Amino acid sequence: MKLNFLSKILMLINLVLLTLQLFLMDTFWDFYHYPFLNLMVPVIALINVIFFVFWIIKFKWPFLLFIFSVLIGFKEWGKLYKFPNNAIPISSGIKVMSFNVRLFNSFEWIDSKSVPQSIESFVNKESPDLVCLQEYSKEFSPKFKNYPHQYIASSKKNGQNGLCILSKYPLLNRGRLDFEDSNNSALYADFFYKKDSIRIYNVHLESLRINLKDTLFTQEHSQKFIERIQSVVEKQELQIDRFDKVEKKNNYPTIICTDLNNNAFSRVYKRLKDNRLDAFMLSGNGLGATYKLAYFPFRIDFIFTDQKFKVINFKTHDIKLSDHKPISALLEWK
């Protein structure tokens, strides 16, 4: 059908947003000059989906623009959404979980006194072989008695905002990566599986520190907001540099559990993932959102694995025991 003047304007806006999304998703080449825009890819994608539905309802040809963009950037769209995998997962393999537990609700963000016990019950029920916890608190943590091997470390003397690796396998060589001028850090530990040595990392990168008081409705506030995002991302890049120095000395295949505090369209994601597998992209379901940023769902928690693993199953657990959702992956050693 022929487009009127208003429809032509809307089509132009839609075309610009679709093109911008493809560039920001790294469809053609690296495009990380504006970290704030990379962070906003899910929002831009939602607007484009709304446009698509609008054109379908109006029965106008610009709905094809969205279809073409999906075909062009099919792989990158997979970072946003995965259709259900109906394959029946095998029961054997290494099951890994990553969960930012937000200090076990020590400041009572959730109106419940039993959050630590509920987290322990959830972990015991899922029974992963290895668990990586971020924002760990020694004071409020349950004992996790089902996990005889535990590695706990914090950059703070009071044990707050620490990291923890829980394991059913003995943890051998262990270490902590302190990040300069930050309360965040990373841990690693090696373990044996089927006579092979494997390394697991628990990585917690610098927080974006976005809250509901942030606004983009004035030039002054929006400029400060964007500058803060830029500053935090630069700090995250330095933390990846620190990680790379340690990882270069490692000869074992790796599993990385991380609260990245950034999304799958950032250079931070690309650098930490490197040539590893993103477990969600291989066996995830739906949006896979793990965190709500100003009420908008984002996927900022990840499990990356060496290519010597086969990702059998991946799950984002829909429970409300923290401001993050836990994720888990079942991995088969090839």
Where are these regions (language model features)?
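N-terminal, active-site-proximal structural segment of metallo-dependent hydrolase catalytic domains
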Residues: 1-144, 334
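Active-site environment of divalent metal-dependent phosphoester hydrolases
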Residues: 103-107, 137-141, 157-160, 183, ...
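Metal-dependent phosphoester-hydrolase catalytic domains
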Residues: 6-55, 61-65, 245-254, 260-334
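Structured beta-strand-rich core segments of catalytic domains in phosphoester-bond hydrolases
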Residues: 71-90, 117-121, 130-211, 315-318
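Acidic/histidine-rich helix-loop elements
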Residues: 101-114, 209-232
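Short, solvent-exposed loop/turn segments at secondary-structure boundaries
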Residues: 107-113, 177-178, 291-294, 317
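Short amphipathic alpha-helical segments
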Residues: 143-146, 214, 267-270
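Active-site beta-strand/loop signature of hydrolases that rely on acidic residues for catalysis
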Residues: 37, 95-101, 115-140, 189, ...
